[in-house]
């Protein structure tokens, strides 16, 4: 990509050490600039703790980066864990702060149960190991996975989920998150836009994926992620068609967690023709009209 248009790269889904990412907020914003991202949303799992230090680093270093405050909220729909991203939220809004505190409590309870199940499977110290890897951030299943790889119980993160953390396995604990409707509501109350995250990753049939998108749209969701780094052209086209069908704006994001060969900030993030980028809702409000959903 040429130097003349790198500033228009939008990456609206990324993680830091505040949840299950491997880079600090400060390191992430520097990497975003290195990767020629012009607008970055930090969307850690059920926490906004990374936003303030990221803002401070951008200001301190004079980085040419537009930071969008965000969050990725864990929900449950039809026994599936579904993630809803909130973009351009007010991270100080009392309702959002209270809501995320409740999510943190749910996350801590789940982590305790996962550790207890692994203990029964002769894998001691999992909670302490996950907490150590979380470095004070939100403890996620990703931290348990890293701990199990570290202990030699599996060869990779994917192997951990296959052996221990997937549905029906030893360390699996059914999620007890909020509903999609509750996530959308708190995002809207905090002034943000609600985005259905990575809809192609939930292992849903075409029929169930359509049901999910319809449910999200019916409850006043704003957008869905259409473009990601690792994605077939066919999937991107299909997701764009679903967005158009349900009058949803389109978003794009790498879901970056750590430097790796196949997922990178800003990589391969573009929208197919016929959909509109969700960033238009806050960048050009004077040209935006409400649409019937």
From Swiss-Prot:
It is an enzyme of class 3 (hydrolase). It catalyses: a ribonucleoside 3',5'-bisphosphate + H2O = a ribonucleoside 5'-phosphate + phosphate. Disulfide bonds: none annotated. GO terms for molecular function: 3',5'-nucleotide bisphosphate phosphatase activity; 5'-3' DNA exonuclease activity; 5'-3' RNA exonuclease activity; manganese ion binding; nucleotidase activity; nucleotide binding. Its EC number is 3.1.13.-, 3.1.3.97. Mn(2+) 2 binds at residues 20, 45, 257. Its cofactor is Mn(2+). Keywords: Exonuclease, Hydrolase, Manganese, Metal-binding, Nuclease, Nucleotide-binding, rRNA processing. Mn(2+) 3 binds at residues 72, 83, 198. CDD domains: PHP_HisPPase_AMP. Mn(2+) 1 binds at residues 13, 15, 72, 255. One of its GO terms (biological process) is maturation of SSU-rRNA. Disruption phenotype: None of the 3 rRNAs are correctly processed at their 5' ends, each accumulates a precursor with 3 extra nucleotides. It comes from the Bacteria. NCBIfam families: RNaseRnm (NF047791). Belongs to the PHP family. TrpH/YciV subfamily. This is 5'-3' exoribonuclease Rnm. It comes from Escherichia coli (strain K12). The lineage of its organism: Bacteria, Pseudomonadati, Pseudomonadota, Gammaproteobacteria, Enterobacterales.
């Amino acid at each position: 990509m040429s130097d003349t248009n790198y500033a228009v790269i939008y990456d609206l889904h990324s993680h830091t050490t505040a949840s299950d990412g491997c880079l600090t907020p400060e390191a992430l914003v520097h990497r975003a600039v290195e990767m020629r991202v012009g607008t970055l949303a930090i969307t850690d799992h059920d926490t906004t703790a990374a936003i303030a230090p990221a803002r401070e680093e951008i200001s301190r270093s004079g980085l040419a980066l537009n930071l969008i405050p965000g969050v990725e909220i864990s929900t449950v729909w039809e026994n599936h864990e579904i993630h809803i991203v909130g973009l351009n939220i007010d991270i100080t809004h009392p309702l959002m702060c209270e809501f995320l505190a409740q999510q943190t409590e749910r996350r801590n309870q789940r982590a305790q149960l996962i550790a207890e199940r692994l203990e029964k499977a002769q894998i001691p110290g999992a909670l302490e190991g996950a907490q150590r890897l979380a470095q004070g951030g939100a403890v996620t299943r990703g931290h348990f996975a890293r701990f199990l790889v570290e202990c030699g119980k599996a060869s990779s993160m994917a192997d951990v989920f296959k052996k221990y953390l997937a549905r029906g396995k030893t360390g699996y604990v059914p999620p007890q998150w909020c509903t999609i409707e509750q996530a959308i509501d708190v995002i809207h109350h905090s002034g943000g836009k609600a985005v259905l995250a990575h809809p192609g990753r939930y292992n849903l049939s075409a029929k169930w994926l359509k049901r999910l998108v319809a449910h999200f749209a019916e409850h006043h969701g704003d957008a869905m992620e259409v473009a990601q780094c690792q994605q077939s052209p066919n999937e991107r086209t299909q997701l764009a068609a679903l967005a158009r069908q349900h009058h949803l704006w389109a978003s794009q994001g790498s879901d970056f967690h750590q430097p790796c060969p196949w997922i990178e900030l800003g990589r391969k993030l573009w929208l197919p023709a016929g959909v509109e980028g969700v960033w238009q809702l806050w960048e050009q409000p004077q040209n935006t009209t409400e649409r019937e959903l």
